[in-house]
From Swiss-Prot:
Gene behind this protein: fimA
Origin species: Dichelobacter nodosus
UniProt keyword terms in alphabetical order: Disulfide bond, Fimbrium, Membrane, Methylation, Transmembrane, Transmembrane helix
Main location: other
Protein's recorded name: Type IV major fimbrial protein FimA
GO cellular component term of the entry, any: type II protein secretion system complex
SS bonds (residue pairs): 57-67, 140-153
Amino acid sequence: MKSLQKGFTLIELMIVVAIIGILAAIAIPQYQNYIARSQVSRVMSETGQMRTAIETCVLDGKEAGECFIGWTGSNLLDGDFTAGTESTAAATGQAGITIKYPVAADDEGNIVATFGRNAAAAIKPQTLTWSRSKEGTWTCATTVEAKFQPTGCKDK
């Protein structure tokens, strides 16, 4: 009488475990890169929304203290709130955000976001900066590695 094999042998199970290990070794770093890229894109979008409020305030002739930015805090930013260095800062109440408020329509300004402890390890403590030219155009620049930079945000 022949006995029928039921189940898997130890060798077959070890091969499956090895294959899963190889796939995990490839997938986990790629997933971490994806997370870092998505976090940079998220902060770019969140801080980019402040441009409209700042531009509206500047064109309406409001000072930084009179202007409500309407910022929703981000858990990806960290650090102490720092006032802008060359002109009055618009208070966002968010640590990790620095705003150099343009005092006139033909003045320069910027929004600087510093990635904090909740951000992916590959992007902290890097920065993302929106800069306003004297002509009123905004450009994005960042200090994160090129592989994490979203479209429209170049090296700083």
